[in-house]
Amino acid sequence: THIPTASAADMAWANAYLFCAPTRFGGMASQMRAFIDTLGGVWAQGGLANKAVSAMTSAQNAHGGQESTLLTFYYTAMHWGSIIVAPGFTDPALFKTGGNPYGYSHTQGAAFTDEVKASIGHQTKRLIEMADKLTA
């Protein structure tokens, strides 16, 4: 089966980006950083600027660096000139899944509950709504 993967060309046409990457030693996995490194040409042409961006992560254990992963990714988005759309504390669903204002984070072995789905859904909906406002 074919699993679609994002490309630099996809980043050029998309109005919003939702990055989901595992945490490794307090940062994004090297495979995601390698993809980000391919975006230099699109970035140099301004193709990543003024786009809505949000991020989610996972780690093997609680306190495994999830928040630092999200924050350091947002530094990259700031270099791009993207507009960060974190979930903040804008929905009660977030408090039922850890209350991370930077983006949803999942711990390995934790159940994929309705609360988790609601938290991810809220962050995704917020990103899409903000992207729509930016492109209106």
Positions of PLM-derived features:
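Glycine-rich phosphate/pyrophosphate-binding loop and the adjoining helix
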Residues: 2, 86-136
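Helix-loop-strand module that forms the ligand-binding subsite of alpha/beta enzymes
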Residues: 3-91, 95
